Regions:
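S-adenosyl-L-methionine
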Residues: 203-223
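Core catalytic lobe of class I
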Residues: 1-200, 223
Length: 223
C-alpha cells in the first residue's frame, strides 16, 4: 500500500488515525507493506499513532527546494519523508545501484538483529551497492500540487511487491502510483474524492496501459 498526500491543507488538519489504521490492518496482507508520504508535523503524529507496526523512515531528496518565501527565516525544504509500516517482514527486493568494484577487506560488524560482532569481508566484484534510506528523485509538477515522481513510486513498488501483486493508493491524486503499477506489472486500486483529479488519474493510467500494450506488441513483433 502506498499513500500519497491528497492535499497540502488536508494533511495539515488532525487526522482520525484510529479508524484509518483499523481499515489498513483489515485489508493489508500479513506480509504487506504500508508506505506513507508525510511532512511534518503530520509525519511525527503518524508514527506515534502506530508504534507497533512502525519500522523505519525513508527520505525522498528532491532536486529542487521549496519554501522560497521563508528562505530568509529558515532553511528551504528539499526532502519529504516516507514512513514504512508492516505487521511481518514484507517482500523486500533491494534496488541496488551500480558503482565501481571495491574490496575494503575484513571488518568487524555488529549484527542489527542480535547485536553480536561478526567479522565480515566487505567486497563487491561488480560494484553493486545496497540502497540507503536516502532516495534521490527529481520532482514532477504537471498534474497535482503534491505529485510524486513515477520513478520514485516505481522504486517503492519494485522493492516491496512482486509482479502481479495488488497495490492500493487511498489518496491517489493524479494517479502516479497507478501509472507506476502499470509500468511494473502490478495491479492497482486507487481512491480519489476530487472528480477533477480522478479524471486526470484515469486518463494517465489508461495512457500508460496503451503505452505498455504498444511496447509489448512491438517487442513481440520484433522477435
Amino acid at each position: 500500500m502506498i499513500a500519497e498526500e491528497a492535499d497540502c491543507d488536508e494533511w495539515d488538519k488532525a487526522q482520525p488515525f484510529a479508524p484509518m489504521w483499523e481499515e489498513y490492518r483489515r485489508i493489508i496482507k500479513p506480509n504487506g507493506c504500508i508506505a506513507i508520504f508525510a511532512g511534518e508535523p503530520f509525519s511525527s503524529a503518524l508514527v506515534q499513532s502506530n508504534l507497533k507496526m512502525y519500522r523505519y523512515e525513508l527520505i525522498w531528496k528532491k532536486n529542487v527546494a521549496t519554501d522560497f518565501l521563508s528562505a530568509r527565516r529558515r532553511p528551504m525544504r528539499i526532502h519529504d519523508k516516507i514512513q514504512v509500516f508492516y505487521k511481518k517482514a514484507p517482500v523486500y527486493h533491494p534496488q541496488k545501484t551500480k558503482g565501481e568494484p571495491y574490496d575494503r577487506g575484513w571488518q568487524n560488524r555488529k549484527s542489527e538483529l542480535y547485536g553480536e560482532m561478526k567479522r565480515q569481508r566487505s567486497k563487491s566484484e561488480n560494484g553493486e551497492r545496497f540502497p540507503t534510506s536516502i532516495l534521490n528523485f527529481k520532482r514532477e509538477y504537471h498534474f497535482h500540487p503534491t505529485q510524486k515522481p513515477v520513478p520514485l513510486l516505481a522504486w517503492l513498488i519494485r522493492t516491496y511487491t512482486d509482479v502481479g501483486d495488488v497495490v492500493l493508493d487511498p489518496f491517489m491524486g493524479s494517479g502516479s502510483t497507478g501509472v507506476a503499477c502499470v509500468q511494473e506489472g502490478r495491479q492497482f486500486i486507487g481512491i480519489e474524492r476530487e472528480d477533477t483529479y480522478f479524471e486526470v488519474a484515469k486518463r494517465r493510467i489508461e495512457e500508460a496501459q496503451t503505452t505498455e500494450r504498444w511496447g509489448s506488441t512491438k517487442t513481440g513483433g520484433a522477435e
